[in-house]
Curated annotation (Swiss-Prot):
Family from the record: Belongs to the ZIP transporter (TC 2.A.5) family.
Subcellular location: Plastid, Chloroplast thylakoid membrane
Cross-referenced PANTHER family: FE(2+) TRANSPORT PROTEIN 3, CHLOROPLASTIC, ZINC/IRON TRANSPORTER
Full protein name: Fe(2+) transport protein 3, chloroplastic
Membrane-side (Lumenal) residue stretches: 119-137, 291-301, 355-369
Lineage: Eukaryota, Viridiplantae, Streptophyta, Embryophyta, Tracheophyta
Protein function: May play a role in the transport of iron in the plastids.
Keywords, sorted A to Z: Chloroplast, Ion transport, Iron, Iron transport, Membrane, Plastid, Thylakoid, Transit peptide, Transmembrane, Transmembrane helix, Transport
Residue intervals on the Cytoplasmic side: 86-97, 159-269, 323-333, 391-404
Source organism of this protein record: Arabidopsis thaliana (Mouse-ear cress)
Domain of life: Eukaryota
A single cellular component GO annotation: plasma membrane
Membrane topology recorded in Swiss-Prot or TrEMBL: Multi-pass membrane protein
GO MF annotations in UniProt: iron ion transmembrane transporter activity; zinc ion transmembrane transporter activity
Biological processes per GO annotation: iron ion transport; response to nematode; zinc ion transport
Length: 425
C-alpha cells in the first residue's frame, strides 16, 4: 500500500511537472516518500486497536477486577463517611473538620475538571485520526466546557427556584389552619418565616412564646440586618437556627426572622447535591470505560491508584452535600450507591467490549472528547461556585482566621495532589 501511495503521487508529477518547476526527480521523491510514510503510519494507527509493548490480556483482565474492587470500596467509603458522620460531633457538616476536608475534596474536583477531563477532551478532539474539518478549525473542547458550565448554571438556578417555591407552598399550607384561629392583631409566620424543627414563630428552647402586638402587615416591614450587623458577633446567633421576634409596646412591631435562610439554604443544598452527582456520574462512566477497554497492565496499574484516590474524595464532597441537603435515608442511600457503582459498571462495560473496541476510531474519539469536555465544564462550575465559593465566602469562614488558613492549604493541597496524578494517569 505504501508503494501505491508513492506511485500515485509521482505519476502526475512527472506527467504535468511540479508546482515550482524546479524540483528534480530525486528531490521530488525525497519530498513525497516521507509524506506517504506519515500518511500510511497514521492510517495504520487509526484503523488498528491498541498496540502496546506492555500489552497482556490475561494480566489486564485480572487487574480490572482489582480496579473494580478498589474503586468501589474507595467510592463507597468516601460517600458514606459524611452520611454516617452527620450524627457524630466531630464530623457534623457545620464543624471545622468537615469544612477543611470538604475544601480538600473541592480542590480534587477542580483539578479533575481542569487537568484531567479538559485535557483528555482536548487530546481526543485534537487527535490526528479525526478529519481536519471541523475538529482542527475550532477550539471545541473549551467551547463544550463553556456550554456545560452555562447549562449547569441554568439548571442550578431553575432547580433552586423550584425547591424554594415548593418549600414556600408547604410552609403556607402548614400555617393555614392556625391563621383562622388567630386574632387580627397577631401575625402568623408568613412564607419563608418558619423555623426549624417545627417550632412556632418566636418559640424559644424553653417552650415559651413571646409574640407581642405584631400586626398582620408586619410581614411587609420585615427587617434584614444591615451590613454592619452581619458581623462575627451575631454569627453565633444565626447559627443557632431559631427565629427571634421582637415586639414594640405600641402594638406596631416588626419581626426579625432568620428562619427563612434555612429554607433557602435547604433548597440550595438539594440542588447542589443533585447537580454535583450528575457531573460526577457523567465523567465516571467515561473513566470506567477507558480503563475497561485498556489491555495494558502498564496503563491500568497507575489508573487504579489514581482513580481510587479520586473517587474517595469526590465521594466525600458528594456525601457532604447529600448530608447538608438532609435527604431521607432511602434517597441518600440511593444517591450514594449510584455514585459508588458508576465507575465499576463502566469498567465492566469496557471489559466486555474491549476485544472489538478501537479507541482510535472517529466515533470513539469524538464521543470521548465531547463527554470529557462537558464533564470538565460541570465539575469546574460545581467546584468553584457551589463548593469553594459557598464555603470560602461564608460568615463562618470570614470570622475564623485559623479556619481560613487551614482551608486554603487543604484546597491547594487537594488540587496539587490530584494534578500531580496526571503524570502517571
Amino acid at each position: 500500500m505504501f508503494f501505491v501511495d508513492v506511485l500515485w503521487k509521482l505519476v502526475p508529477l512527472y506527467l504535468f511537472g511540479s508546482e515550482t518547476k524546479s524540483l528534480s526527480a530525486t528531490e521530488s521523491i525525497l519530498q513525497i516518500v516521507p509524506e506517504a510514510m506519515a500518511a500510511t503510519s497514521s492510517n495504520v494507527l487509526c484503523n488498528a486497536s491498541e498496540s502496546d509493548l506492555c500489552r497482556d490480556d490475561s494480566a489486564a483482565f485480572l487487574l480490572k477486577f482489582v480496579a473494580i474492587a478498589s474503586i468501589l470500596l474507595a467510592g463507597a467509603a468516601g460517600v458514606t463517611i459524611p452520611l454516617i458522620g452527620r450524627n457524630r460531633r466531630f464530623l457534623q457538616t457545620d464543624g471545622n473538620l468537615f469544612v477543611t476536608a470538604k475544601a480538600f475534596a473541592a480542590g480534587v474536583i477542580l483539578a479533575t475538571g481542569f487537568v484531567h477531563m479538559l485535557a483528555g477532551g482536548t487530546e481526543a478532539l485534537k487527535n490526528p485520526c479525526l478529519p481536519d474539518f471541523p475538529w482542527s478549525k475550532f477550539p471545541f473542547p473549551g467551547f463544550f466546557a463553556m456550554i456545560a458550565a452555562l447549562i449547569t448554571l441554568f439548571v442550578d438556578f431553575m432547580g433552586t427556584q423550584y425547591y424554594e417555591r415548593k418549600q414556600e407552598r408547604e410552609a403556607s399550607e402548614s400555617v393555614e389552619p392556625f391563621g383562622r384561629e388567630q386574632s387580627p392583631g397577631i401575625v402568623v409566620p408568613m412564607i419563608g418565616e418558619g423555623t426549624n424543627d417545627g417550632k412556632v414563630f418566636g418559640e424559644e428552647d424553653s417552650g415559651g412564646i413571646h409574640i407581642v402586638g405584631i400586626h398582620a402587615h408586619a410581614a411587609h416591614h420585615r427587617h434584614s440586618h444591615p451590613p454592619g450587623h452581619d458581623s462575627c458577633e451575631g454569627h453565633s446567633k444565626i447559627d443557632i437556627g431559631h427565629a427571634h421576634a421582637h415586639g414594640h409596646g405600641h402594638g406596631h412591631g416588626h419581626g426579625h426572622v432568620h428562619g427563612g435562610l434555612d429554607a433557602v439554604n435547604g433548597a440550595r443544598h438539594i440542588v447542589v447535591s443533585q447537580v454535583l452527582e450528575l457531573g460526577i456520574v457523567s465523567h465516571s462512566i467515561i473513566i470506567g470505560l477507558s480503563l475497561g477497554v485498556s489491555q495494558s497492565p502498564c496503563t491500568i496499574r497507575p489508573l487504579i491508584a489514581a482513580l481510587s484516590f479520586h473517587q474517595f474524595f469526590e465521594g466525600f464532597a458528594l456525601g457532604g452535600c447529600i448530608s447538608q441537603a438532609q435527604f431521607r435515608n432511602k434517597s441518600a442511600t440511593i444517591m450514594a450507591c449510584f455514585f459508588a457503582l458508576t465507575t465499576p459498571i463502566g469498567i465492566g462495560i469496557g471489559t466486555a467490549v474491549a476485544s472489538s473496541f478501537n479507541s482510535h476510531s472517529v466515533g470513539a474519539l469524538v464521543t470521548e472528547g465531547i463527554l470529557d469536555s462537558l464533564s470538565a465544564g460541570i465539575l469546574v462550575y460545581m467546584a468553584l461556585v457551589d463548593l469553594i465559593a459557598a464555603d470560602f465566602l461564608s460568615t463562618k469562614m470570614r470570622c475564623n482566621f485559623r479556619l481560613q488558613i487551614v482551608s486554603y492549604v487543604m484546597l491547594f493541597l487537594g488540587a496539587g495532589l490530584m494534578s500531580s496524578l496526571a503524570i502517571w494517569a
